[in-house]
From Swiss-Prot:
Record-linked PROSITE patterns: RIBOSOMAL_L20
A Gene Ontology BP annotation from the UniProt entry: ribosomal large subunit assembly
A GO term from the CC aspect: ribosome
Domain of life: Bacteria
Family annotation (NCBIfam families): rplT_bact
Gene3D superfamilies assigned to the protein according to its UniProt record, in alphabetical order: 6.10.160.10, Ribosomal protein L20 (1.10.1900.20)
Family named by the database record: Belongs to the bacterial ribosomal protein bL20 family.
GO molecular function, a single term: structural constituent of ribosome
Organism ancestry: Bacteria, Bacillati, Bacillota, Bacilli, Bacillales
Gene: rplT
Protein name: Large ribosomal subunit protein bL20
Record keyword Ribonucleoprotein present: yes
Pfam families: Ribosomal_L20
Role summary: Binds directly to 23S ribosomal RNA and is necessary for the in vitro assembly process of the 50S ribosomal subunit. It is not involved in the protein synthesizing functions of that subunit.
Database matches in CDD domains: Ribosomal_L20
Length: 118
């Protein structure tokens, strides 16, 4: 039986990895072995950070809401509890957007929350 070296398959596989490593610094975009390791690590980072991004944005929204709530004499937790008691269902993303772009509307929501806490 003749020996099969698989040259075209190997070349195609390596070329694909080098293509994925385009834009990487130094030997990471030219040498297959290093590029392969970096691409694998990059894919892991991408997978992990797609989930991390959701947590990061939630943290950011909560920080913004808390800052705006404290400007209106409430803490974040009391604001959220007051809104829940008032039956106002506004998600954190929208509340943070209001806190940044429409301070009057946020102040009205804070007033409603304050009144429902008593």
């Amino acid at each position: 039986m003749p020996r099969v070296k698989g040259g075209t398959v190997t070349r195609k596989r390596r070329k694909k990895m080098i293509k994925l490593a385009k834009g990487y610094y130094g030997s990471k975009h030219t040498l297959f072995k290093v590029a392969n390791q970096q691409v694998m690590k990059s894919l892991l980072y991408a997978f992990r950070d797609r989930r991390q991004k959701k947590r990061d944005f939630r943290k950011l929204w909560i920080t913004r809401i808390n800052a705006a709530a404290r400007m209106n004499g409430l803490s974040y937790s009391r604001l959220m509890h007051g809104l829940k008691l008032a039956g106002i269902e506004v998600n954190r993303k929208m509340l943070a957007d209001l806190a940044v772009h429409d301070e009057k509307a946020f102040a009205e929501l804070a007033t409603v929350a304050k009144n429902n806490l008593k």
